[in-house]
Amino acid sequence: MASFKIVIVCLALLVAVASARRRDMMSDDELDYHFSKRGIPCACDSDGPDIRSASLSGIVWMGSCPSGWKKCKSYYSIVADCCNQ
């Protein structure tokens, strides 16, 4: 009886693995959009001096800003930059 249960479980796993579908690859534009929305918001110089009322229009990028983005903070940081499009 135990071997019958093992066979049933193995068949169920085989069906689950065989019927799994691969995700379609996203285009570069879709990836850029999703990455830009996953970042940590930051306040650009244009948002004003008060952080509590700022709109936080920038996104923190590790290293430097990617292509199509510009640095929007006046201070320099080696680790990350506050960037916006």
From Swiss-Prot:
Signal sequence region: 1-20
SUPFAM superfamilies, per the entry: Defensin-like
Protein family per UniProt: Belongs to the sea anemone sodium channel inhibitory toxin family. Type II subfamily.
Subcellular location: Secreted
Expression tissues: Expressed in ectodermal glands and in clumps outside of the extodermal layer. Is not expressed in nematocytes. In adult female tissues, shows similar expression levels in mesenteries (gametes-producing tissue), tentacles, pharynx and physa.
Name the record gives this protein: N.vectensis toxin 1 2
Key words, A-Z: Cleavage on pair of basic residues, Disulfide bond, Ion channel impairing toxin, Neurotoxin, Secreted, Signal, Toxin, Voltage-gated sodium channel impairing toxin
GO cellular component, as recorded: extracellular region
Family annotation (Pfam families): Toxin_4
An example molecular function term from Gene Ontology annotations: sodium channel regulator activity
Keyword Repressor listed: no
SS bond partners: 42-82, 44-72, 65-83
Keyword Disulfide bond part of the UniProt annotation: yes
Main location, first listed in the record: secreted
Domain of life: Eukaryota
